[in-house]
Structure formats: structure tokens, C-alpha cells
């Protein structure tokens, strides 16, 4: 993944994992299926937390709140790996379609003509900005600062919308 999505091949994965190319091909019919499986694996904890938050309220603004909490309460190793894969895929636009759809779905239904909707959108964007800055290595954000950032997002953007 260090060399981009073009270098992410079944052969490369087999060599890195110390297994046969046939073993990888048995599990994954294509490079796309392998990438999808990687995202599903790394996204598992996120989705569980997201679904827990929206279980009783699936409104658009609560889905944004769920995204914020799921991003905040993350597994660092999984997110770091997911960010590495995302960075590799940025070099190959055809793999970005499902990611674009995922982002659109997260903000679907947020009414940005209202103060609450505008705050929800800002909270979402602040969350994504913090994630990208931390996991793409563009800014050193330690665990304490990570907690402070999400406390600020919650108190300045999320909690205000529910008052």
C-alpha cells in the first residue's frame, strides 16, 4: 500500500502474508473484492458503534452524531490501516466510488437550511478533518488532544443542536 493501489495486487498480498497466490485468489476473486474485504474488516468496529448510536433514533442529525462518536471511540490500529488504504486509493479514482457514496449517505437528509443542520454538517466535517489530519500524518495529534478535539466538537457543535 506504500506504493499506491496499483501496487496492491493479489501477488503482493500473498508475499506479505507468507501464503500462496492461489490461497489469496481462493478467498478473493478479484483485487476489488480484496479491497472491499479490507475495508469491511477495518470498518467493523466503527459500524458496530455507529449502529449502537442510531438504534433508537435514525434521524439524519443523529446519524452525524453516530459518525462522530464512532470515529472518536475507534480502534487506532484499524483506523491507521484504513487510512493507509484510503491514501492508496486516492491515487486510483475508480476505487473511490463506494467511498464517495458512503460519505454522501452519512450526510443524507441533513437539512443545512437550519441552524441544527448547519452545526451537524460542521461537526461531521470537523470529525473528518481531525481523522484525516491524524491518520494521514499531517498533524501530530496525541490521545489527549484527540479527546479534547472531540470534546470541543461535542460541546460546540453537537450538544448545542439538542438544546
Task: Give the predicted meaning of each segment.
Residues 5, 26, 55, 87-91, ...:
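Amphipathic alpha-helical interaction elements
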Residues 38, 71, 89-90, 130, ...:
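Generic structural signal for hydrophobic core residues of well-folded globular domains
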Amino acid at each position: 500500500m506504500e506504493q499506491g493501489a496499483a501496487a496492491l495486487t493479489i501477488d503482493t498480498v500473498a508475499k506479505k502474508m507468507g501464503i500462496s497466490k492461489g490461497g489469496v485468489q481462493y478467498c478473493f476473486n478479484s483485487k476489488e473484492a480484496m479491497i472491499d474485504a479490507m475495508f469491511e474488516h477495518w470498518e467493523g468496529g466503527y459500524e458496530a458503534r455507529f449502529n449502537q448510536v442510531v438504534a433508537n433514533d435514525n434521524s439524519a442529525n443523529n446519524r452525524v452524531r453516530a459518525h462522530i462518536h464512532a470515529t472518536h471511540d475507534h480502534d487506532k490500529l484499524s483506523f491507521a490501516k484504513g487510512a493507509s488504504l484510503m491514501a492508496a486509493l486516492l491515487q486510483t479514482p475508480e476505487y473511490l466510488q463506494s467511498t464517495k457514496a458512503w460519505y454522501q449517505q452519512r450526510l443524507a437528509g441533513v437539512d443545512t437550511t437550519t441552524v441544527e443542520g448547519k452545526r451537524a454538517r460542521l461537526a461531521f466535517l470537523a470529525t473528518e478533518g481531525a481523522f484525516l489530519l491524524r491518520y494521514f500524518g499531517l498533524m501530530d495529534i496525541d490521545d489527549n488532544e484527540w479527546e479534547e478535539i472531540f470534546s470541543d466538537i461535542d460541546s460546540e457543535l453537537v450538544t448545542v443542536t439538542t438544546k
